[in-house]
């Protein structure tokens, strides 16, 4: 194996990414080297491409970016015992310390010292990526490559949706991006009664309909209260999944929750905004912030969903070769796409 590889690198502190030749990562005794087959583009990668304020203060330059992927193990360190050469794998993109209180209690997703693959250390927009054995996840044979490549965002959706009991509940999802749609699909799969998803982007709303979400609301044209009345809801939503990061959507969600309702919040707002805390208090709402995936309970659940027949393939709207990565980023930046998967 050559000691150089192709990779998408943030080489300059400006808009864009560049295909470069960089050294193949060297592995330590507890590491696994993975040949990447497929990579998917995340919203985080778009922030890095755009070189916005968050990226400017977060990303060291140069940096190989990307964290949504699947591939094949090609080398393991001498202390690795759970994975072998030739194995199909994906990986948890949050590297945790293993030493803090939460890590030692089995709550790795709450680690205060988390490092992000493709953010704080070299990522998976490359021919090879190195991960600690702990972060590598085996992919069953009946899970397609392209689905395994989007397990990172699917995990965000599963973590958010499964934060609260969904059986027989009325669920509102704000934000019909890929994660919001997948969250709505999980809610339906888990036995929610009514699942309503809102957005203002017609392309994403159409995608939600194609993926079987029954009640799709264009918030720029319809009032949520009118939709609730038409579908027979009289007391408000039991569970909210906030995926948009948009102030009007979050405020509308709080207004439409039933007393005692529960809201899981994944959407990241571009700037701070106010909500009516009196409504939160007097309606006795339960608000829970969500970040990443529970390690590794969320991974077990999402593999089970796919093996149980949940078809995520329509959420992938663009399948391209890695040399066409600019087209993939253009699709993501437009807001008029589902997931974009790139083949190495």
From Swiss-Prot:
One GO MF annotation is: zinc ion binding
Record site feature (Important for catalytic activity for the proton relay mechanism but does not participate directly in the coordination of zinc atom), residues: 152
- Per the UniProt entry, the Enzyme Commission number(s) are 1.1.1.103
Question: What keywords does the record list, in alphabetical order?
Answer: Cytoplasm, Metal-binding, NAD, Oxidoreductase, Zinc
| Superkingdom | Bacteria
Q: What class of enzyme is it?
A: oxidoreductase
Purpose: Catalyzes the NAD(+)-dependent oxidation of L-threonine to 2-amino-3-ketobutyrate.
What is this protein called in UniProt? L-threonine 3-dehydrogenase
Q: From which organism does this entry originate?
A: Rhizobium meliloti (strain 1021)
């Amino acid at each position: 194996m050559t000691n150089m590889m192709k990779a998408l690198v943030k080489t300059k502190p400006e808009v864009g990414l560049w295909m470069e030749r960089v050294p193949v990562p060297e592995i330590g005794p507890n590491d696994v080297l993975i040949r990447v087959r497929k990579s998917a583009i995340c919203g985080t990668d778009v922030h890095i491409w755009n070189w916005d304020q968050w990226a400017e203060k977060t990303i060291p330059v140069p940096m190989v970016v990307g964290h949504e992927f699947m591939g094949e193990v090609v080398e393991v360190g001498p202390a690795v015992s759970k994975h072998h050469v030739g194995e199909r794998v994906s990986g948890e993109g949050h590297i945790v310390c293993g030493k803090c209180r939460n890590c030692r209690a089995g709550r790795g997703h709450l680690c205060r010292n988390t490092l992000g693959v493709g953010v704080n250390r070299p990522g998976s927009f490359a021919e090879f990526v190195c991960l600690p054995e702990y972060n590598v996840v085996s992919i069953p044979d009946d899970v397609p490559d392209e689905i395994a490549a989007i397990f990172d965002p699917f995990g965000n959706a599963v973590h958010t949706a499964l934060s609260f009991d969904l059986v027989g509940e009325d669920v509102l999802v704000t934000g019909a991006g890929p994660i919001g749609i997948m969250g709505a699909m999980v809610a339906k799969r888990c036995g929610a009664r009514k699942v309503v998803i809102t957005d203002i982007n017609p392309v994403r709303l159409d995608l939600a309909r194609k993926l079987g979400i029954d009640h799709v609301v264009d918030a720029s044209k319809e009032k949520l209260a009118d939709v609730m009345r038409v579908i027979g809801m009289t007391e408000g939503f039991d569970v909210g999944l906030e995926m948009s990061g948009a102030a009007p959507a979050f405020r509308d969600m709080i207004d439409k929750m039933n007393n005692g309702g529960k809201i899981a919040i994944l959407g990241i707002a571009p700037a701070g905004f106010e909500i009516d805390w009196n409504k939160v208090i007097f309606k006795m709402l339960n608000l829970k912030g969500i970040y990443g995936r529970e390690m590794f309970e969320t991974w077990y659940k999402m593999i089970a969903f796919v093996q149980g027949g949940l078809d995520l393939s329509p959420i992938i709207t663009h399948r391209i070769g890695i040399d066409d990565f600019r087209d993939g980023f253009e699709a993501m930046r437009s807001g008029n796409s589902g997931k974009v998967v790139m083949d190495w």
